[in-house]
Amino acid sequence: MEAKKIVITGSATRIGAAIAKSLAGYDVKITLHYNKSAKEVKKLKDELENFGSEVFLIKADLSKIMQAKKIIPFAYKKMKGLDCLINNASIFEKDDLSNF
């Protein structure tokens, strides 16, 4: 059976990174999307590759449509297909609960 090809948006930290780690060790190829967390995503890539996963990185600001549109074609070309898209990207801003 051929490796599953997965894209995870917002995968450098928190939930996205946890999702990627949960797939480590399975027969998968993963494209990790990130925007500002380059250091974190490179560390994650190394971790996943140590489990035998093939990993690709793409930086894109999803608030800019032209950058967002590049993710799927990039992943499709690198992984030679796409089986699953996990839309996890978000904006996370720490703030005091009383400010909501």
Q: Where does each model-flagged region fall?
A:
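Aromatic pocket-lining residues of Rossmann-like dinucleotide-binding sites
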Residues: 23
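Conserved glycine-rich cofactor-binding loop
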Residues: 5, 12-14
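The beta1-alpha1 cofactor-binding region of Rossmann-like NAD(H)/NADP(H)-dependent oxidoreductases
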Residues: 38-39, 59-71
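Conserved glycine-rich Rossmann-like NAD(P)H-binding loop of the short-chain dehydrogenase/reductase
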Residues: 26-43
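Rossmann-fold cofactor-recognition segment
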Residues: 48-64
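Rossmann-fold scaffold of SDR-type NAD(P)-dependent oxidoreductases
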Residues: 9, 82-89
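Conserved mid-core segment of classical short-chain dehydrogenase/reductases
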Residues: 69, 92-100
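NAD(P)H-binding Rossmann-fold N-terminus in SDR/SDR-like oxidoreductases
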Residues: 14, 18, 92
